[in-house]
Amino acid sequence: MNIPSDRFMIPCHLMGPHFSPCAASEKTGIQFYKQTEVGEIEHIGKRKEIAKVGHASFEPPLEFQQTENPYIGLFWMIDTLTEHIDTLRSCGADDIWIDLGVVSHLDVKLEFEPDFLMKLANLKIPFLISGYIETADE
């Protein structure tokens, strides 16, 4: 496995017109860092709107992100979703996706083992990958 010298950002986003982040968190133990229930007031820029969909986001706990191997957090995310995907869907999460951000000073080569790719494929969710160049002042 090729390990980049920099870091990953690994948020998972969930949403749906009947999705309840509170129920999902209660049933799975997942701690969302951002969540909105259907019907709550949302601040969108300077406007306030009533949320038509429930949505939430979560990331691996810090101990899985702050390691020499940035893949550890990604493995945690896949394992957590594998364990809880049915419960999240039963709580109304119709749309679930992982948005991997790779932050680097240089070019990065990502390498995924077949077992990891099979686990990811079995989730049947989108997996987005974006690259970001970190400059000296960041």
Functional labels for PLM-detected ranges:
Residues 1-138:
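Acidic (Asp/Glu-rich) sequence patches and key acidic residues
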